[in-house]
A protein has these predicted regions:
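Conserved catalytic or regulatory cores that recognize and/or transform ribose-phosphate-containing ligands
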Residues: 1-139
Length: 139
């Protein structure tokens, strides 16, 4: 299964950990943005290149996972995932659930019918998404 993980730069290590579990189990990361990290100071051409790569990767993924909280890019990617969702799972994860319950932290798109919201410790998310269970319900 092809997957994409979106999150803020501050959560890049969690994205790497989750991607490692999924790739070790035979799944394909459509674009590993954690390899280049923050590119905002690298100029307009580089940012354009990364933007195209990330849009294509989100669109091509069969499963999209957003680790919340995320930044502007994460929320843009959530929108792309919802808009291109044919045969795609769109999973939003929050350790505390605050992003889904606190008005100053939530977003209307978190409640789109195509979205699966998951609240649990990160280690539990990893277990839920482990290869043998990747296609089963996470509810």
């Amino acid at each position: 299964m092809r997957f994409y993980i979106a999150t803020g730069l501050s959560n890049a290590e969690m994205a790497k950990t989750l991607a490692g579990v999924l790739t070790r189990n035979g799944h394909e990361f459509t674009y590993n943005w954690t390899e280049h990290g923050d590119i905002r100071s690298e100029g307009e051409d580089r940012m354009t290149e990364v933007a195209f790569s990330e849009v294509r990767a989100v669109r091509d993924a069969e499963m999209f996972i957003a680790l919340l909280p995320g930044g502007c890019g994460t929320h843009t990617e959530i929108g792309i995932a919802i808009a291109s969702r044919s045969n795609k799972r769109v999973i939003l994860w929050s350790e505390t659930g605050d992003e889904f319950t606190k008005p100053d932290r939530c977003c209307a798109f978190y409640f789109h019918p195509a979205v699966e919201r998951i609240c649990c410790p990160f280690e539990e998310l990893i277990s839920k998404l482990d290869a043998d269970r990747i296609d089963t319900s996470l509810s």
